[in-house]
From Swiss-Prot:
<feature type="modified residue" description="Phosphothreonine">
    <location>
        <position position="380"/>
    </location>
</feature>
<keyword id="KW-0866">Nonsense-mediated mRNA decay</keyword>
<feature type="modified residue" description="Phosphoserine">
    <location>
        <position position="144"/>
    </location>
</feature>
<dbReference type="InterPro" id="IPR031953">
    <property type="entry name" value="mRNA_decap_C"/>
</dbReference>
<feature type="modified residue" description="Phosphoserine">
    <location>
        <position position="145"/>
    </location>
</feature>
<dbReference type="GO" id="GO:0008047">
    <property type="term" value="F:enzyme activator activity"/>
</dbReference>
<protein>
    <recommendedName>
        <fullName>mRNA-decapping enzyme 1B</fullName>
        <ecNumber>3.6.1.62</ecNumber>
    </recommendedName>
</protein>
<comment type="subunit">
    <text>Interacts with DCP1A.</text>
</comment>
<dbReference type="GO" id="GO:0110012">
    <property type="term" value="P:protein localization to P-body"/>
</dbReference>
<keyword id="KW-0378">Hydrolase</keyword>
<dbReference type="GO" id="GO:0034504">
    <property type="term" value="P:protein localization to nucleus"/>
</dbReference>
<comment type="similarity">
    <text>Belongs to the DCP1 family.</text>
</comment>
<dbReference type="Pfam" id="PF16741">
    <property type="entry name" value="mRNA_decap_C"/>
</dbReference>
<keyword id="KW-0963">Cytoplasm</keyword>
<dbReference type="GO" id="GO:0097398">
    <property type="term" value="P:cellular response to interleukin-17"/>
</dbReference>
<feature type="region of interest" description="Disordered">
    <location>
        <begin position="187"/>
        <end position="222"/>
    </location>
</feature>
<keyword id="KW-0007">Acetylation</keyword>
Length: 578
């Protein structure tokens, strides 16, 4: 079999061996030589001795249709692991009969033991010839085409030579791979196919100054400071503060819709319009006020402002206030219960006269009252089932039980005092019953003089602060703070709002009797305790401030009344000092 394989003659055993080899390597084309019995050993570098690998069997030398062109394989009889080694230029063979030693490209040393020494010499000679031919091809193929010609098999491609050549060319070109600097040559400037970069934002200043490598064409972003940012928005809060009032003053005819939006729970209390944005009032608006209003807002020695927090008061509808049995609500001048309030100084009376002018100013409250009636007159006919907040005149009802005899005498003394029932008008045009300013001031002066001439100077009448911005009534702080000692003796006071209608002699309450002609402008006590009562939320300081500011800016008549009251108080003070 070995002779037949060596001579290249066809045989049945040769075909079986070739088929078995092609199962492991399909590129094997033919068998060149065969050794019947060999064993493979490896040299151990640590032990410095030969070690058996467990591979022994028949050795086949063959040619391949692909690179590498030659190789040998030991078909192992002991196991399924065969030993295959390609024949390349890196192999180094040495004959030591009956051993054939060789070293491969990984510098591993192996020894093949041959059972037949003649086979050992023949295979050793063949291995050396094939290795030398591979080395010659590698030397000549480095400068020639990677395509090589095999003996008698046509034109084939050497993959290893192609990879080697590509590596060499890459190594040579790596030294000069850096691009050269572009110059202003004519070849570059005149080339139409050359794509030149175009600046994104060219500026004329950069063209004149020349290219600056450290600066970009994009402008630097502007950094806004907090001063510049808030300086531009100083006027915005002022405009936003005035807008809600003008909007509701323009649409005051749609008061039913505003009632549903502003007072979802309490039907007798109208929420303030300025409570939506109470903090939008800026400081420059306060600086534009006249001295009289600043004195009124900051609090003069005679003025006692109400608490700014409405939570300090009892505001449940239909129940009297716990402090002395007093219900919050505006108090008209000349009330028979004025004798129960504490003593006030002359400056206090002058300050309250200013506030009474605020109440009597036409069109001063309706702009902030979405719940006011839309009729053309001040006192219009209102259905009994409507909201009590729509009424325009406030009365104090009589006591629940007969008072003490001492207090009855007090009532007789105070009942003789003249009074003026000042109604809060809806607008300037729809208030024909509002008294002129001079007549109102004259009557206020008469009331004040008669109160000073009363036999009980220690209990002079004090006019509490009352304002109805946004359709709400303020409670009486002075009565709560000054009448703690008289709570057990004083009867409960009830503030009721009765709708009015016009008569020939003046105003008449719908639910009571018609007022006499001589006393149509006096405040009368009502005996109907079962009528509906309203406890409203007081205005905060910011809400009152916004209401006054809006009236000063938009209503000239309001400002004129305040100024006349201010002049009158100054002249009265000068007369008293002289």
């Amino acid at each position: 079999m070995a002779a037949a394989a060596a001579g290249g003659l066809p045989g049945k055993g040769h075909d079986i061996s070739l088929a078995a080899l092609r199962r492991h390597d399909p590129y094997i084309s033919r068998i060149v030589d065969v050794a019947s019995q060999v064993a493979l050993y490896t040299f151990g570098h640590r032990a410095n001795e030969w070690e058996k690998t467990g591979v022994e069997g028949t050795l086949f030398v063959y040619t391949r249709s692909a690179s590498p062109k030659h190789g040998f394989t030991i078909m192992n009889r002991l196991s399924m692991e065969n030993r295959t080694e390609p024949i390349t230029k890196d192999l180094d063979f040495q004959l030591q009969n009956p051993f054939l030693l060789y070293r491969n490209g990984t510098l591993s040393i192996y020894g093949i033991w041959f059972y037949d020494k003649e086979e050992c010499q023949r295979i050793a000679k063949l291995m050396k010839n094939l290795t030398q031919s591979e080395q010659l091809k590698a030397c000549h193929g480095a400068g020639s085409s990677p395509v090589t010609l095999s003996s008698g098999e046509g034109q084939e491609v050497d993959i290893l030579q192609m990879l080697t050549k590509a590596k060499d060319e890459y190594t040579k070109c790596k030294t000069c791979s850096e691009p050269k600097q572009m110059t202003n040559s004519s070849a570059i400037c005149d080339n139409p196919k050359l794509i030149k970069p175009v600046p994104v934002r060219p500026s004329s200043s950069q063209r004149l100054q020349g290219p600056a490598p450290s600066k970009t064409s994009d402008p630097e972003p502007q950094h806004l400071s907090l001063t510049a940012l808030f300086g531009k928005q100083d006027k915005a809060p002022c405009q936003e503060t005035v807008k809600p009032s003008r909007t509701f003053a323009h649409h005051h005819h749609h008061h039913h819709q505003q009632q549903q939006e502003t007072r979802p729970v309490h039907h007798g209390v109208a929420c303030s319009l300025s409570c939506e944005e109470p903090r939008k009032l800026s400081l420059p608006v306060e600086k534009q006020l006249c001295p009289a209003i600043q004195k009124l807002m900051l609090g003069s020695p005679g003025l006692h402002p109400l608490p700014q927090h409405p939570e300090q008061w009892s505001c449940k509808s239909g129940s009297p206030s716990p402090a002395g049995g007093i219900l919050p609500g505006p108090v008209q001048l000349g009330s028979p219960w004025n004798g129960r309030v504490a003593h006030c100084t002359q400056s206090t009376c002058r300050g309250h006269k200013l506030l009474e002018q605020l109440q009597g100013a036409p069109g001063a409250v309706h702009k902030y009252n979405p719940c006011a009636p839309t009729g053309p007159a001040v006192a219009t006919q209102v259905a009994p089932g409507q909201s009590v907040a729509q009424s325009q005149l406030v009365y104090f009802s009589g006591p629940l039980q007969p008072p003490a005899p001492g207090h009855q005498a007090l009532r007789k003394e105070q009942g003789a005092l003249p009074a003026q029932a000042v109604s809060l008008s809806g607008s300037q045009e729809s208030s024909p019953t509002v008294l002129p300013t001079q007549e109102l001031l004259r009557k206020l002066q008469v009331v004040h003089q008669e109160q000073q001439a009363a036999p009980r100077p220690a209990l002079a009448a004090r006019f509490p602060v009352s304002a109805q911005g946004s359709g709400t009534e303020k409670p009486l702080e002075a009565w709560v703070s000054k009448t703690a000692s008289m709570e057990k003796q004083a009867p409960l006071l009830q503030s009721t709002c009765a709708p009015l209608r016009e008569t020939d002699n003046g105003l008449m309450a719908l639910g009571g009797q018609e007022l006499p002609a001589a006393s149509s402008n006096l405040l009368l006590p009502l005996q109907n305790w079962e009528s509906s009562t309203v406890a409203s939320r007081p205005l905060t300081r910011l809400q009152l401030q916004e209401a006054l500011l809006n009236l000063i800016q938009n209503d000239d008549n309001f400002l004129s009344i305040i100024y006349e009251a201010y002049l009158f108080s100054v002249t009265q003070a000068a007369m008293r000092t002289t």
